[in-house]
C-alpha cells in the first residue's frame, strides 16, 4: 500500500507546484525577460573618433547607447542616440538606415522615401531601438555590442533640389562603430566607439563569482630548490598562506623524542584568498551564445597536500626547502624558510611560531629549542636544519639560504648522527629519529650523503658535513668528541660535551668529520637576514652551519660569522649549545631572543636584542658564550664598521662593514676589515675555537679526543689535543676587544681556541703578520692579523700571531706545529698551537696556547710540544688522525626577479637592456703638399654611398675628399732638398664603464718625419702604392619609434578601463661600413696625402657590437722628380652605418583591488638596439686630365647631432677652378648624388587619465612636437652640378605592435602607419561584419511558460485517470 500512497503524494505535489506557478524544469532560460543593464561601458573612450570623419569631410556625429535590456539568450534590445555637431534640416535627407546589424533584423530603416518610412524628424538628433545578438564576450561577465553602420544619404532623389544651400561636406556616407581599428596615434578608423555590458544584464556579475586560483607545485620539505614550508607541530600539518613562490609549500615534521612512531603526515594548506575575478579576452565570432567562456574563474578553495614520513632516519639528498609555522611565511626571494615548534626536517629554511619572511638570498634559522642549521646542527633536543631556522618570532630570511627552527629534534639538509655512527654526505641524527633533506640518523646508523658518527671515529673525506653528539646533534660540518675526528674537507668540525652541531662538522662523544659548508639560525626573536648570508638564533641549544654560541665557550673558526643567543645558539659558521659550540664556517649570522636584521651580504646573529647587520659581513651576539667566525658581541651593542662580521647579544648589533667583530659583556668596535670576538664565557673564533667544554670549530672539532684537520679549514679540540692545520683567528674574552685591522680577535675566560693564535694567563705579543690571542683583558688588534687574549691584555702590534703557554714551543718555519698527548698529523695546512707551554711564532704562521684545551683552525696541540718545520702542519694527538686534503666552500645565490608575461597578454614581457651607442664623426683631414712644379690642380669632391640597413631604411653617408695632382709644364724641375712629411694618426684607448659597456677614447697624434728625395734631375722612381684601410667605419643614424603606452584602472563599480598614450621615441641605429680593398693608388713624382679612418670595435653589456672611429692621415714618401703620368683612382669603399632603434615592449603587473577583483597595469618600455647598414660608394669621381683649365663643382657636407640625438648633415655646393696649362681638358659636371639629412618635427598627442571626485575617468591631452630626421638624396641636374633636383625622400616610420594579441593589421594611411592594437579598455574586440543571422529566437518566453503549465496539467490529468487503477 505504500507505493500507491507515495505515487499519489508525488502527483499532488506536482499539481500543487504547478498551480502556484513555481517554475518547472520546462521553463526556458529566457523566461525572466526585460532585465535592464545598469552598466553600459564605452570600450574605448580615449580614441579620436573625429579623425576619420575629418578625413572624409563629414560633419561630426556622436553616438551613445542609452539603454540595454536582455531579451533572452544572447539577444539584447539596445537604444542608441545619435547627434550631429550642427543641425541639418530634414528636407536634405533622402534615406537614413542602420545596416550591418547582427540581430534579428540586419537593416533597420529609420527614414526613406523609397521605403516609405519616416520614423525620425531630425537626422542630426534621433534615437533608435533595435535588437542585436551579442556574441563576443569581453570576459566571463561582459559582452560586446556587435558593430554596425549608420548610412546617411543626403541630397539624393527629390532632396537634390536643395543642393545649393548644402554646407556640411560629404552628402552620402556610412558611420561605423567599433574599438578595433585605429592607428598608433589613437586615430580611430571607425566613427563611434564600441560598448559592452554585463552578460544577461546580470548586475551582480563579478561580485559573487569566485575565481579559481592556480597554485604552484606542492613540495615536501625534503625536496630541493627554494620552497616555503611551515609547521606548527611535529609531524603535524603546515600551512603557508600568501606565498609568492612558484612552488607550493609543504612541511615535513620529524619525529619527536620517541623514535618508534611509524609515520608522520605533514600537510600544506593554502588559505582561501579573497575572491578575485580574472577577465579574459575572447575573439570568437561564435553563434549568438555566450556560454563559451574560456576565462578562468578563481575559487577560494583550499588545496591540501599531505606527505607521510616515517620517523625513522630519512636521508634527504636534495638541497633547500622552506617551512614556516603558525604564521604566514612569505618567501619572496630565491631562499627558503622553515620553522617548527616540534622536530622539523627541512632541507633549507624553517621558521616557527611566527611569520618568517625570506626576501633575500640569505638564510635564517631560529628556534626556541635546539635547532641545527644549514649544514648540520644539533641541540640539547636533537635539531638539524639544512640552512636557517627561526622560532618564536618572525624571522625574515632574505637570502637564498635556508632557515629552520624547531623546539624538538630537527634534522636538516646535511646529516647528523648521534649515539651511533652515522655516515652521510650531509647526515644528521638525533636521539629522536629526525629526517632531513639530506640524511639524518638517530640511535641507529644512518647513511647519508655526508657522514656523522658518535661514540666512534668517523672520517668524512668528501666535502659533505657530519655532526654527532652525545645528545643527538648534527651539523653540516663535522665535530667529534671523545675520539679523534678527521675533517678532510674545508668544512668545520665542532664538538661539545653537550649536543652541539655546526654548519661544517660537529661531533660529540665521538669523532665526526664534517667536510661541507655552513648555515645560519636565529631563534626566540625575529631574525631578518636581508643579505645573501645566513642567520641562526635559538633560545635553546641551536647549531648552525657557521656560527654557534652557548652558555659555554663557543668557538667560531670561520672568517665571517656572527652568533648570539640567550641560550646556546649556533650559526651558519658557529654553533652554540649548553656546552661549547664551535662555528667552523666562514659566513653566518645567528640571533636569538631578539630580531636580527642582516641587510648585508654577510650573516648576522644577535640574541636578546635586535642585531642589524647592514654590511656584507656577519654579526653574532650571545649573552652566553658566543663564537663567531668574524665578530661577536654579547650583552652590549657591537658596531662593526669594517667589512668583517659582528655579533651582539642582549643589545642591537649593527655590522655595517665587511669585517667581523665579537664582544661580550662590553661593546666591541671593529672598525677595520678584521674580526673580533669576546665573551664572558669561553668563545672560540673564526678558525678554531675551544672551550672548557670540548668544542671544535670551523673545519674540524673534536672533544675529549684529538681531531686533525689537514685542509684549509679549522680544527678545534677540547679536553684533548686537536690539531687545526687551517688558517688563523684571534679571540679575546671578558673584556671589550677592538679589532681595527682586517684580522679576527677572540677571547674567552674559559678555554678558547682560535684558528690563529691564542694565549692564556699571560700577555702574548704577536710581532709577525700572524694572530695573537689573550684572555681576561682587552685585546687591540691594530694590524691585519688576529689577536686573542685571555686573563691579561695582549697587544698585537705586528701582523703576526703568537701564542704561548707555560712552556715554550718553537715554530721555526712558516707552518704550525701542534703536539698533543697523542700524535696527530695534518698534512695540508700551516699553523702552530701549543697549550700549557709558551709558544713563540716568529713566522707568518699562527700559534695558540691555552691553560685549557684549545684547538685552533690551523693546528693546536696540548700537553706536549709539536714542531712543524715545513710549510705544512704536523699534529699529534692521543690517537693519530690524518686529513689529506680539504677546503671549505660557501655559496649563496642572489635573487633575480623576472616579470613573467601575463596570461592575458602573453606577448608582453619586460626586457631590460643597456645599449651603448658610439657616435664617431669622421672629419676628413686635408693635407696640402707643396710641390716644386709650376702648376698644381686641386680637385675637391664628395664621396657618397647609399645602402639599406636591416630595418629596410635607406641611409647614406657623404664626406669631402681632396686630391692634389701635379700638372706638368714645359720645364722639368728636380727637387734636391729633403721634404718634411707630417703623419697624423689617432691613439685610442678602450675601457669598461660602470654599466659594463666597452667604451673608447681617442686623441690625435701628429708625427713629423723627414722624407729624403733624389738629387738627380733625370731620376725615374718606381710607383708608390698605398692600400686603402680595411677598417669598418661606424655611423650613427637616428630614427623615431612610435609606440602606444596603456594603463588599466578599475572604477568603484568594478569596471576595468584602459588608457592609451601614443609616444614617439627617437632612437639611434649603429651601422658599420666596410671599406673597399683600396682607396687611392698614387704614382710617384709627387708627395701624396692619404686620409683614412682607424676604428676600434668592442661589445657592450647588452651584447651589441659598438665601435669608435677616428681619422688618420698618412703622407707617403716619394722621390723628388715629377712626371706626367700621374693619375688617381676613386674610392669604392663600402661605408657601414650603425642605426639604432628602440624596441617597445609592454610590461604588465597584476594586483587585486579592494573589491577582490584582479586588475592589470601596463607599462611600456623602450629598449634601444642597433642595426647595421652597409652603404655602397657612388661611381668614381671624374679624374682631371691635363692641358686645359678645369672647373670642378662638388658638394661639401658637414654632420652634426641635434637635440634629439639624431645625426643631421648640411651640404653646400663648392666650385674649384684649377690652374693648369692651356691644353688641359675640362672635366664634365659632377654626377654624384648628394644625400642630405633634413630635420622635421613629428607631432603627437599624449593623453593622461585621472579620476575626478565623482569617480569618473577623465582624460587630458597634450600635444608634443618631437624632432626627427629624414634622409633625402639629390641627383645633379643636366646643366651642371649646381642644379640639383630632389628625386627621392625616404621616410622610415616603424610600426610596432604593442602586444601579441593584435588582431588584424590595418592598411597604412598617408599620415602614419596604422597598427591594430588591443581595445582600449581591455580585451580585443574582433570586427563584426554585416552578416545577418538567419535564425530567430522567440522574443516572448511566456509562451513557453504556458506550454509548460499545459503540459504539466495534461500529465496530471493522465495520472488522475490512472489513480483508480492503482487503488
Curated annotation (Swiss-Prot):
UniProt GO BP: cell adhesion involved in single-species biofilm formation; cell-cell adhesion; cell-cell self recognition; filamentous growth; flocculation; homotypic cell-cell adhesion; invasive growth in response to glucose limitation; pseudohyphal growth
Keywords linked to the UniProt accession: Cell adhesion, Cell wall, Disulfide bond, Glycoprotein, GPI-anchor, Lipoprotein, Membrane, Repeat, Secreted, Signal
Basic and acidic residues composition-biased segments: 281-292
Free-text description of this protein's post-translational modifications in UniProt: Extensively O-mannosylated. The GPI-anchor is attached to the protein in the endoplasmic reticulum and serves to target the protein to the cell surface. There, the glucosamine-inositol phospholipid moiety is cleaved off and the GPI-modified mannoprotein is covalently attached via its lipidless GPI glycan remnant to the 1,6-beta-glucan of the outer cell wall layer.
Lipidated sites in chain (GPI-anchor amidated glycine): 1346
Domain Flo11: 31-207
Keyword presence, Flavoprotein: no
Chain residue ranges for the region called 4 X 10 AA repeats, Ser/Thr-rich: 210-249
Disulfide bonding pattern of the chain: 37-201, 44-179, 141-205
Chief subcellular location: secreted
Lipid bilayer topology: Lipid-anchor; GPI-anchor
GO MF term (any one): identical protein binding
Family assignment from sequence similarity: Belongs to the flocculin family. Highly divergent.
Protein's name according to its UniProt entry: Flocculation protein FLO11
Amino acid at each position: 500500500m505504500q507505493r500507491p500512497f507515495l505515487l499519489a503524494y508525488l502527483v499532488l505535489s506536482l499539481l500543487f507546484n504547478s498551480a502556484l506557478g513555481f517554475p518547472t524544469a520546462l521553463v526556458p532560460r529566457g523566461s525572466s525577460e526585460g532585465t535592464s543593464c545598469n552598466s553600459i561601458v564605452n570600450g574605448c573612450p580615449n580614441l579620436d573618433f573625429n579623425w576619420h570623419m575629418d578625413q572624409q569631410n563629414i560633419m561630426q556625429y556622436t553616438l551613445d547607447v542609452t539603454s540595454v535590456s536582455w531579451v533572452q539568450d544572447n539577444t539584447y534590445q539596445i537604444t542608441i542616440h545619435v547627434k550631429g555637431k550642427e543641425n541639418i534640416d530634414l528636407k536634405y535627407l533622402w534615406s537614413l538606415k542602420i545596416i550591418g546589424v547582427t540581430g534579428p533584423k540586419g537593416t533597420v530603416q529609420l527614414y526613406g522615401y523609397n521605403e516609405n518610412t519616416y520614423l525620425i524628424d531630425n537626422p542630426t538628433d534621433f534615437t533608435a531601438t533595435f535588437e542585436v545578438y551579442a556574441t563576443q564576450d569581453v570576459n566571463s561577465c561582459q559582452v560586446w555590442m556587435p558593430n554596425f553602420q549608420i548610412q546617411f544619404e543626403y541630397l539624393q532623389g527629390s532632396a537634390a533640389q536643395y543642393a545649393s544651400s548644402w554646407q556640411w561636406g560629404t552628402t552620402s556616407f556610412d558611420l561605423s562603430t567599433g574599438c578595433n581599428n585605429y592607428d598608433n596615434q589613437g586615430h580611430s578608423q571607425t566613427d563611434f566607439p564600441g560598448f559592452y555590458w554585463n552578460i544577461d544584464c546580470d548586475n551582480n556579475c563579478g561580485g559573487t563569482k569566485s575565481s579559481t586560483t592556480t597554485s604552484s607545485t606542492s613540495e615536501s620539505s625534503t625536496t630541493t630548490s627554494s620552497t616555503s614550508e611551515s609547521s606548527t607541530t611535529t609531524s603535524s600539518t603546515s600551512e603557508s598562506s600568501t606565498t609568492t613562490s612558484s612552488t607550493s609549500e609543504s612541511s615535513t615534521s620529524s619525529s619527536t623524542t620517541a623514535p618508534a612512531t611509524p609515520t608522520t603526515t605533514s600537510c600544506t594548506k593554502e588559505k582561501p584568498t579573497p575572491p578575485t575575478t580574472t577577465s579574459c579576452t575572447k575573439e570568437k565570432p561564435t553563434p549568438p551564445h555566450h556560454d563559451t567562456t574560456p576565462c578562468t574563474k578563481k575559487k577560494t578553495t583550499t588545496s591540501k597536500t599531505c606527505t607521510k614520513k616515517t620517523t625513522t632516519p630519512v636521508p634527504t639528498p636534495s638541497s633547500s626547502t622552506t617551512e614556516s609555522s603558525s604564521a604566514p611565511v612569505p618567501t619572496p626571494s630565491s631562499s627558503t624558510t622553515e620553522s617548527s615548534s616540534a622536530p622539523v626536517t627541512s632541507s633549507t629554511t624553517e621558521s616557527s611560531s611566527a611569520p618568517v619572511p625570506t626576501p633575500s638570498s640569505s638564510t635564517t634559522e631560529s628556534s626556541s629549542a635546539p635547532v641545527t642549521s644549514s649544514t648540520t646542527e644539533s641541540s640539547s633536543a636533537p635539531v638539524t636544519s639544512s640552512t636557517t631556522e627561526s622560532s618564536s618570532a618572525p624571522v625574515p630570511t632574505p637570502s637564498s639560504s635556508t632557515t629552520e627552527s624547531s623546539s624538538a629534534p630537527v634534522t636538516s639538509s646535511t646529516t647528523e648522527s648521534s649515539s651511533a655512527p652515522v655516515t652521510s654526505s650531509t647526515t644528521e641524527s638525533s636521539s629522536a629519529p629526525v629526517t632531513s633533506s639530506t640524511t639524518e640518523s638517530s640511535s641507529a646508523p644512518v647513511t647519508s650523503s655526508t657522514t656523522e658518527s658518535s661514540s666512534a671515529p668517523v672520517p668524512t673525506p668528501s666535502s659533505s658535513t657530519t655532526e654527532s653528539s652525545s645528545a643527538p646533534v648534527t651539523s653540516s660540518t663535522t665535530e667529534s668528541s671523545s675520539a679523534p675526528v678527521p675533517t678532510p674537507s674545508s668544512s668545520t668540525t665542532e664538538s661539545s660535551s653537550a649536543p652541539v652541531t655546526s654548519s661544517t662538522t660537529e661531533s660529540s662523544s665521538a669523532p665526526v668529520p664534517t667536510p661541507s659548508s655552513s648555515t645560519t639560525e636565529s631563534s626566540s626573536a625575529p631574525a631578518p637576514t636581508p643579505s645573501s648570508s645566513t642567520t641562526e638564533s635559538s633560545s635553546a641549544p641551536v647549531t648552525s652551519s657557521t656560527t654557534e654560541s652557548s652558555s659555554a665557550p663557543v668557538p667560531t673558526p670561520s672568517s665571517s660569522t656572527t652568533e648570539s643567543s640567550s641560550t646556546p645558539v649556533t650559526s651558519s659558521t658557529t654553533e652554540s649549545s649548553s656546552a661549547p659550540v664551535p662555528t667552523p664556517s666562514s659566513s653566518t649570522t645567528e640571533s636569538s631572543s631578539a630580531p636580527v636584521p642582516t641587510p648585508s651580504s654577510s650573516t648576522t646573529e644577535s640574541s636578546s636584542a635586535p642585531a642589524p647587520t647592514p654590511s656584507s659581513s656577519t654579526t653574532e651576539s650571545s649573552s652566553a658564550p658566543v663564537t663567531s667566525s668574524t665578530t661577536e658581541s654579547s650583552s652590549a651593542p657591537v658596531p662593526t664598521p669594517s667589512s668583517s662580521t659582528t655579533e651582539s647579544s642582549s643589545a642591537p648589533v649593527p655590522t655595517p662593514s665587511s669585517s667581523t667583530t665579537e664582544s661580550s659583556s662590553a661593546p666591541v668596535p671593529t672598525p677595520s676589515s678584521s674580526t673580533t670576538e669576546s665573551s664572558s664565557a669561553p668563545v672560540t673564533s673564526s678558525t678554531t675555537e675551544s672551550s672548557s667544554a670540548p668544542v671544535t670549530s670551523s673545519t674540524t672539532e673534536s672533544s675529549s679526543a684529538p681531531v686533525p684537520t689537514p685542509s684549509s679549514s679549522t680544527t678545534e679540540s677540547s679536553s684533548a689535543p686537536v690539531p687545526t692545520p687551517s688558517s688563523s683567528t684571534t679571540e679575546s674574552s671578558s673584556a671589550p676587544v677592538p679589532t681595527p685591522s682586517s684580522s679576527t680577535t677572540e677571547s674567552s675566560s674559559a678555554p678558547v681556541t682560535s684558528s690563529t693564535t691564542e694565549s692564556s694567563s699571560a700577555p702574548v705579543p704577536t710581532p709577525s703578520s700572524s694572530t695573537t690571542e689573550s684572555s681576561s683583558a682587552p685585546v687591540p688588534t691594530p694590524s691585519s692579523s688576529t689577536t686573542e687574549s685571555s686573563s691579561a691584555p695582549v697587544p698585537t702590534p705586528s701582523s703576526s700571531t703568537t701564542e704561548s703557554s707555560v712552556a715554550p714551543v718553537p715554530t721555526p718555519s712558516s707552518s704550525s706545529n701542534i703536539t698533543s698527548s697523542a700524535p696527530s698529523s695534518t698534512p695540508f695546512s700551516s699553523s702552530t698551537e701549543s697549550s700549557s707551554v709558551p709558544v713563540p711564532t716568529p713566522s707568518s704562521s699562527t700559534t695558540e696556547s691555552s691553560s685549557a684545551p684549545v684547538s685552533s683552525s690551523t693546528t693546536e696541540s696540548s700537553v706536549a710540544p709539536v714542531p712543524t718545520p715545513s710549510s705544512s702542519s704536523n699534529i699529534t694527538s692521543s690517537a693519530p688522525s690524518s686529513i689529506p686534503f680539504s677546503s671549505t666552500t660557501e655559496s649563496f645565490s642572489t635573487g633575480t626577479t623576472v616579470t613573467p608575461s601575463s596570461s592575458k597578454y602573453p606577448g608582453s614581457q619586460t626586457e631590460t637592456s643597456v645599449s651603448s651607442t658610439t657616435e664617431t664623426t669622421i672629419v676628413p683631414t686635408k693635407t696640402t703638399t707643396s710641390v716644386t712644379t709650376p702648376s698644381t690642380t686641386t680637385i675637391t669632391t664628395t664621396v657618397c654611398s647609399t645602402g639599406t640597413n636591416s630595418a629596410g631604411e635607406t641611409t647614406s653617408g657623404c664626406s669631402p675628399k681632396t686630391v692634389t695632382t701635379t700638372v706638368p709644364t714645359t720645364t722639368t724641375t728636380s727637387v734636391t732638398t729633403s721634404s718634411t712629411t707630417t703623419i697624423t694618426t689617432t691613439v685610442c684607448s678602450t675601457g669598461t664603464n660602470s654599466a659594463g659597456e666597452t667604451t673608447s677614447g681617442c686623441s690625435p697624434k701628429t708625427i713629423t718625419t723627414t722624407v729624403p728625395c733624389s738629387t738627380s734631375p733625370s731620376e725615374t722612381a718606381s710607383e708608390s702604392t698605398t692600400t686603402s684601410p680595411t677598417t669598418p667605419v661606424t655611423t650613427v643614424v637616428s630614427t623615431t619609434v612610435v609606440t602606444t603606452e596603456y594603463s588599466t584602472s578599475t572604477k568603484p563599480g568594478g569596471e576595468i578601463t584602459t588608457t592609451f598614450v601614443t609616444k614617439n621615441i627617437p632612437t639611434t641605429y649603429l651601422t658599420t661600413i666596410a671599406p673597399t680593398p683600396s682607396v687611392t693608388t698614387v704614382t710617384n713624382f709627387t708627395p701624396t696625402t692619404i686620409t683614412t679612418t682607424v676604428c676600434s670595435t668592442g661589445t657592450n653589456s647588452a651584447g651589441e657590437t659598438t665601435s669608435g672611429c677616428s681619422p688618420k692621415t698618412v703622407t707617403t714618401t716619394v722621390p723628388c722628380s715629377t712626371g706626367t703620368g700621374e693619375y688617381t683612382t676613386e674610392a669604392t669603399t663600402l661605408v657601414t652605418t650603425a642605426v639604432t632603434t628602440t624596441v617597445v615592449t609592454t610590461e604588465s603587473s597584476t594586483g587585486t583591488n579592494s573589491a577582490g577583483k584582479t586588475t592589470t597595469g601596463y607599462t611600456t618600455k623602450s629598449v634601444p638596439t642597433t642595426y647595421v647598414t652597409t652603404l655602397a660608394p657612388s661611381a668614381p669621381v671624374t679624374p682631371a686630365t691635363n692641358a686645359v683649365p678645369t672647373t670642378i663643382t662638388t658638394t661639401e657636407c658637414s654632420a652634426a647631432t641635434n637635440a634629439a640625438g639624431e645625426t643631421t648633415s648640411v651640404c653646400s655646393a663648392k666650385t674649384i677652378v684649377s690652374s693648369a696649362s692651356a691644353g688641359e681638358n675640362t672635366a664634365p659636371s659632377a654626377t654624384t648624388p648628394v644625400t642630405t639629412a633634413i630635420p622635421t618635427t613629428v607631432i603627437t598627442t599624449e593623453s593622461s587619465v585621472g579620476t575626478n571626485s565623482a569617480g569618473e575617468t577623465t582624460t587630458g591631452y597634450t600635444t608634443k612636437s618631437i624632432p626627427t630626421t629624414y634622409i633625402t638624396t639629390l641627383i645633379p641636374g643636366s646643366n651642371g652640378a649646381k642644379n640639383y633636383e630632389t628625386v627621392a625622400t625616404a621616410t622610415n616610420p616603424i610600426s610596432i605592435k604593442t602586444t601579441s594579441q593584435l588582431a588584424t593589421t590595418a592598411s597604412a594611411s598617408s599620415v602614419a602607419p596604422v597598427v591594430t592594437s588591443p581595445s582600449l579598455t581591455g580585451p580585443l574586440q574582433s570586427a563584426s561584419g554585416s552578416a545577418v543571422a538567419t535564425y530567430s529566437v522567440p522574443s516572448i518566453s511566456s509562451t513557453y511558460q504556458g506550454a509548460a503549465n499545459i503540459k504539466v496539467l495534461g500529465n496530471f490529468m493522465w495520472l488522475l485517470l490512472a489513480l483508480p487503477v492503482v487503488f
